[in-house]
Swiss-Prot record:
Pfam families, per database record: Peptidase_S24
Gene: impA
CDD domains in alphabetical order: S24_LexA-like
Keyword Transmembrane among UniProt keywords: no
Higher taxonomy: Bacteria, Pseudomonadati, Pseudomonadota, Gammaproteobacteria, Enterobacterales
Active site positions, chain numbering: S64 (for autocatalytic cleavage activity), K101 (for autocatalytic cleavage activity)
Name of protein: Protein ImpA
Keyword Glycoprotein: no
Length: 145
């Protein structure tokens, strides 16, 4: 997995982008035309980053987590202060490189790929070094032109 680091935006500074959050939920469509006002505002930095000093971004590479909603090229929001729990998607260090996998603590510690490809196998390293917990996955639905 190749890694690209991105500087986290400071939610309290000029990097903060507040956008309208509509109260209506949409069923695979747009907000109702009758909803002409936003009930509140949403700052994506505040929503995605609860601990700025412990949060960083990585770009996912590969297909080993495609059935867990992590696609090749997705932006991962990672919190180093979050305590890893069984079933969390984590960034772990294996042989000096980062990998994104599901953490299994039972019956024995393991890093599990969640893929539709049988080529990826569950890893059972002697020592698992967890670098952080993936708290959000940002996925583009349209290619940049």
């Amino acid at each position: 997995m190749s890694t690209v680091y991105h500087r986290p935006a400071d939610p309290s500074g000029d990097d903060s982008y507040v956008r309208p959050l509509f109260a209506d939920r949409c069923q695979a469509g747009f907000p109702s035309p009758a909803t002409d006002y936003a009930e509140q505002e949403l700052d994506l930095n505040s929503y995605c980053i609860s601990r700025p000093a412990a949060t960083f971004f990585l770009r996912a590479s590969g297909e080993s987590m495609n059935q867990a909603g992590v696609q090749n090229g997705d932006l991962l929001v990672v919190d180093r202060a979050e305590k890893p729990q069984h079933g969390d998607i984590v960034i772990a260090e294996i042989d000096g490189e980062f990998t994104v996998k599901r953490l299994l603590l039972r019956p024995r510690p393991a890093l599990e790929p969640v893929s539709d490809s049988p080529e990826f196998r569950t890893l059972y390293p002697e020592n698992i070094c967890i670098f952080g917990v993936v708290t959000h996955v940002i996925h583009r639905t349209r290619e940049l032109r």
